[in-house]
Regions:
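Flexible beta->alpha loop and helix N-cap segments adjacent to enzyme active/binding sites
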Residues: 1-221
Length: 221
């Protein structure tokens, strides 16, 4: 489940009761936040149309990206709509993000978002983990940026059906680097995960994020 906690218990209890009483089955949808229209119309910033190949190349070159797409996620995990994305091959990327963007403790790890068809090549687990709820051993030394000190990672597996845009940006990075994953952490700086375009832009401005992608628009510092 995407919301592991009291809020998830409440939602699950409601769905169970609805099924028992009305035989109503609710389809899972982790992206249950607000849909924002005309996102950039009120912002006097220069922006370009998003090109996934170019964004993936920038990540491969060491840039760190704020990634804002559609509706926000339910629960406390960033699952590809309110994320900070970076190159998992960089052994220093954890320190860079912790010290210049997240402003948090050094010991806290970062998660990989990996293409579902490739997760078994890099992680010792038999089951996919679409909600970033599974911790497993890392089998490769090619991705130190997402490997914790005990050689584990809390993985998110991504397929096209789950989140097409997120899948596509990871896939473009894979085509460039041969690594089918990105470092994925929540889009925030010592506060709740960003919800609105205004919140995303303010966080972008006051941190060392290099690029901000809001749906199909790109802002570069």
């Amino acid at each position: 489940p995407p919301a592991i906690g009291d809020e998830g218990q409440a939602i699950g209890t409601y769905q169970h009761a609805d099924y028992m009483i009305n035989k109503q089955i609710h389809k899972s949808n982790v992206y249950a936040g607000i849909e924002y229209d005309n996102l950039m119309d009120v912002w006097p910033y220069k922006y370009e149309k998003a090109d996934y190949k170019e964004i993936a190349q920038e990540i491969a070159n060491g840039k760190i990206v704020g990634w804002f797409q559609g509706k926000s996620e339910s629960g406390n995990r960033a699952l590809g709509n309110r994320s900070i994305l970076a190159d998992p091959r960089n052994p220093d990327i954890k320190d860079i993000i912790n010290h210049t963007i997240k402003m948090r403790e050094d010991f806290r790890p970062f998660a990989p978002a990996v293409l579902e068809e490739h997760y078994k090549e890099y992680f010792d687990t038999r089951l996919p983990s679409p909600y970033m709820s599974r911790i497993c051993k890392v089998k490769s030394d090619k991705v130190p940026g997402i490997t914790h000190v005990d050689n584990t990672a809390r993985i998110q597996t991504v397929n096209k059906k789950f989140n097409k845009k997120f899948y596509n940006i990871i896939n473009e990075f894979y085509k460039i680097t041969g690594i089918p994953m990105l470092l994925n952490t929540s889009f925030n700086c010592r506060e709740p995960i960003v919800e609105s375009p205004k919140h995303a832009i303010n966080t972008f401005k006051r941190t060392e994020l290099d690029i901000l992608v809001i749906n199909d628009k790109v802002i570069i510092k």
